[in-house]
Amino acid sequence: MANLRTQKRLAASVVGVGKRKVWLDPNETSEIAQANSRNAIRKLVKNGTIVKKAVTVHSKSRTRAHAQSKREGRHSGYGKRKGTREARLPSQVVWIRRLRVLRRLLAKYRDAGKIDKHLYHVLYKESKGNAFKHKRALVEHIIQAKADAQREKALNEEAEARRLKNRAARDRRAQRVAEKRDALLKEDA
């Protein structure tokens, strides 16, 4: 058996793969041993005496299955954790995400006309001050604030109507009294 180490090295270089990916035909060892140049190796590659081996399959199915189960919440117990809670998900990042969600909601509501700019400003400051734990809490607060404003407006309108009614009654009474006085003065005269 001839030593074909050089031919294997040359073939790997010509084909453009590693030495372990080159197959030399064991029936043609004498012919391969004669090839001592890259050109000769190219000819052997062309006629199929030297062949580039296929890429070995490295399946990702197990990795995909593991990733899927991680998405479902598996493999995440205390035994699997290396970093601290803060290292795994910094509280700063959690805070930023939460605040961005709240601010986005406020801007959307303001642009849609669901809240006016004054209420927007108040709620913006409150959310910065950690008044709302999540989006639902903010939405509920907005609904409550709008209901309170509506109730207050209705009460104010009611009070204003009562004031106008009382003023009209006072005016009518004063007019009646003035008419009676005029009538009495006319009778006396």
Swiss-Prot record:
Domain of life: Eukaryota
Compositionally biased residues, Basic residues: 59-68
Coiled-coil ranges from the UniProt annotation: none
Cellular compartments annotated: Cytoplasm
InterPro entries, per the entry: 60S_ribosomal_eL19_sf, Ribosomal_eL19, Ribosomal_eL19_CS, Ribosomal_eL19_dom, Ribosomal_eL19_dom1, Ribosomal_eL19_euk
Chief localisation class: cytoplasm
Keywords carried by this UniProt record: Cytoplasm, Isopeptide bond, Phosphoprotein, Ribonucleoprotein, Ribosomal protein, Ubl conjugation
Recorded GO CC terms: cytosol; cytosolic large ribosomal subunit
Family: Belongs to the eukaryotic ribosomal protein eL19 family.
PANTHER family (alphabetical): 60S RIBOSOMAL PROTEIN L19
Name recorded for this polypeptide: Large ribosomal subunit protein eL19A
Record lineage: Eukaryota, Fungi, Dikarya, Ascomycota, Saccharomycotina
